[in-house]
Amino acid sequence: MYPHTDHQTSQPILDVQHLSFRYNGLFALEDITFHLHESERVAVVGPNGAGKSTLFKVVSGVLPPTSGEVNIFGSRPHGHVCIAYIPQRSQVDWNFPVNVADVVMMGRSAKLGPLNWPHKKDWDYVHHALETVELSDLASYQINQLSGGQQQRMFIARALAQEAELMLMDEPLNGLDTPAQEAILSLLDRLKKENVTVMVATHDLEQAANHFDRIMLLNHRIIAFGNPDRVLQTNNLLRAYGGRLRSANGENILTVDDCCDDGEHDHNH
């Protein structure tokens, strides 16, 4: 249902080279270089204010980089329909009068062009996306009637309707109960099978280790990037979190004294 465009899958879906972003004279991101391939699932972890949200906004084209390059299949991200940015729920006005189906249809806007009404094909994409995330019965609901997990799944449906091949999800699991988190993680499993590449910002190191192919440990710079066993080593975590790192219950389980607040305020305009 989600046919991808004729991209060359031999090249990285996302290639970031020496990316920096300055805000009020300070580096929110400094000399970030990495690449992702098709169907990879990557967790981005780091302390509050580390630049996770800023990274997603620059990669998706919401913010322009101060220096460096971002390429999606060899093209700049601005206006690229293959990339979907899913913001933190705290950044959304949930009282805006719009229903679930109309939000998902917004994913088709780049395909429609200006002053072009949706056609049957567009509604087919919307309905299939809603079925995929199990929200078909709530299509006519106002968005403020949804639970937190349903709101998050609605945004994933919008990205599916967009036919996105790269999804950047900013703290999608934050504030959700365990069943809602498991539903999102199950959706990520399905996206991987459909060759969708996903980057997820999260504070949960255990979830990052158990559910993602690679982990990026970020604190304005990339501290480490690779498989979970290599990245989540004590020396790397101490470099990223410093004194906020502690051992849980005297065991060799490292946790972070970091408040999972609803907004990582490194740069949220």
Regions found by a protein language model. Name each.
Residues 167-171:
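Catalytic Walker B motif of ABC-type/P-loop ATPase nucleotide-binding domains
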Residues 68-83:
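Conserved ABC transporter NBD signature motif
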Residues 60:
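Helix-to-loop junction immediately C-terminal to a conserved catalytic motif
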